[in-house]
Amino acid sequence: MKYHRPRRGSLAFSPRKRAKSIVPRIRAWPECDRVRMQGFAGYKAGMTHVVMIDDRKNSPTYGEEVVVPVTVIETPPMKVAAVRVYKKTQYGMQIAAEVWSNNLDDFLDRRLNLPKKEPDVEKLKAAVENGASEVRVVTYTQPYLITGVPKKVPDVMEHRIGGNVEEALDYAISKLGKEISVSEVFDEGAIIDVIAVTKGKGFQGPVKRWGVITLDAKHARSSKHRRVGNLGPWNPHHVRWTVPQAGQMGFHQRTEYNKRLIKIGENGEEITPKGGFLHYGVIRTQYVLVTGSVPGPVKRLIRMRDAIRPPKAHFDGVNIVYVSTTSKQGR
């Protein structure tokens, strides 16, 4: 039993304020020898469960059928809007050169000003010759290809290209202004990290926000029940930031590590349950199944990235026996 418990929540995530953008920001990328985009994005459709053969070598149920909860993420193809080349400086990574495509969708004009010039890829190659160390692409989603998300404005984000700089640049230039599908980025059975903005809960009190204990009947008689018993000592003459208080709860960017991508599907109707996913509907394009839950509500943008600290566990290979498509409406 824990005797000292001033709060249940972690102070590591303070200040608990709303995320700056609903498009999550990825600040670190793992090294990769394969020339490909190291991340992708999709929209959360809902959850279901699958029956699969347990392929973890040291698992007690190895070789047996197990039921695994999965999240369904619809992943329409993404388009490459620009190629960026970065160089290392004493102030961190800085853009050495940038080239935008002139073959972009009109819907992107609602998000940013579209370029009019022809792309000049020679300055990208010159930047690499001058010591640039990393290649990234500016990509955007195509929500107008799906029906579960009621918007047409794309979400713009940046992804790193793996491999050495020369090969990564050639690959990025070949994809400029073209589509990239999720099957070109990830393989079935891959270990990934999931980054998203959590469900927003609004302004909540300290009991729900921090899990502090409610006060006893003596305090309740003076209408003081769901609050903190003490704001701190007389000295210092201010309330410390560690004191659990009311405030914003939810709508924070969070990263969940080491999820397993167990299926990449082309036909969305094969995974759509009877009656469609609640508050989402029918899946129209490509989709992926990710083990466990992911942050955020239905329709939330979910970013996926190569696992930055993958587990040492060994997996034989994904073998799915059954995918549940029963109605999620409770009937």
UniProtKB/Swiss-Prot annotation:
GO molecular function, one term: structural constituent of ribosome
GO biological process, one term: translation
InterPro entries assigned: L3_arc_euk, Ribosomal_L3_dom_3_arc_sf, Ribosomal_uL3, Ribosomal_uL3_arc, Ribosomal_uL3_CS, Transl_B-barrel_sf
GO cellular component terms, A-Z: cytosolic large ribosomal subunit
UniProt family annotation: Belongs to the universal ribosomal protein uL3 family.
Function: One of the primary rRNA binding proteins, it binds directly near the 3'-end of the 23S rRNA, where it nucleates assembly of the 50S subunit.
PANTHER family: 60S RIBOSOMAL PROTEIN L3-RELATED, LARGE RIBOSOMAL SUBUNIT PROTEIN UL3
SUBUNIT field: Part of the 50S ribosomal subunit. Forms a cluster with proteins L14 and L24e.
Protein known as: Large ribosomal subunit protein uL3
Organism the protein comes from: Archaeoglobus fulgidus (strain ATCC 49558 / DSM 4304 / JCM 9628 / NBRC 100126 / VC-16)
Gene name per UniProt: rpl3
